[in-house]
Amino acid sequence: MTASSTKPGPTPCAPRSTGAHAPAPAPAASTPGAPSYHRLTRLSPVLGVRCAPPRRGGGWLPAADLTARPEAVCELIAHDARQGLARYGRPLRPDVAAGFGLHRFVWPVSLLFTLPWFLERRVPLLALGDVSLRRRTDTVELTVRPTGFACLPGDPASGSPQARTAADEQALAAELRCALGGFLAPVLSAFGPQVRRGPRVLWAMATDAVVEGLWYAGGLLGERDRARAELSALLAPGEPAHAPGRPGACGDPAPAPAPFTPGAGFAPPAPGRGGASTARGAGEDASGTDRARASCCLVYTVEPRDMCGGCPRVMRR
């Protein structure tokens, strides 16, 4: 899907050699999420993350600009419009270019939240002002400034002033949905007029990007099956939302996983349904399981043959 740099940058996050569920180091040993960001940067040919303050200039865009400056949204969309013209030889519809731009923002940025949860059982509590990105033709670079985080009671850093302790795994998953949803909500509002979709479809688009991002990272880590299982649990429909009862935490009675679309979309492939897997959507994995996307990226409007294998137009007929 989107791209990024494999270089960790001038101030790389410290590496970690422990397993996926090993406890995170003591608070003085690392920045929250840093070990996960370092592992992703080392493994991914398209995405690089460095722990640093937000940057501006030289192609860098502070994420906060997307809600503070409408022209920043237009700049990102123009980038995808140019890429679409180069790839397909014809212009993208403006709303399609906007949808691509939104997906290619949410896809990498969501990993700043989901990957530390997956690898360290820590959820960084990030604001738009903590992140910046630089997109190139085939790569995306991110800077992130982690401060507070949510963790489990057994985390060695749970007593840190930075930490907010969740009671159990279910509560930590709720913290993740809350933190990521709160980060994305103003971004979806900023893109909405350009994408020309209502809130329900915008959140479906965001859900697809979140799922596809961590599923991609799980593949790099050799843990795609676990990523699929944990995403399915994270977005399982019908469970009551956890209300941690702390300032800044979600106390919303809406059914989990609001505001995200319920269900990660993983299911055995239906017989007789085709569709070519592309970089915009997760198609079939090594175990023969298809993922049905919650939204359509509308690529067929510019290239009818270039349709995701998991497109709801293919999977849900």
Spans of model-derived segments:
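Short amphipathic alpha-helical segments
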Residues: 1-7, 310-317
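Generic N-terminal leader/targeting and pre-domain segments
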Residues: 1-100
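Hydrophobic, aromatic-lined core segments that form the binding pocket/scaffold
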Residues: 65, 70-285
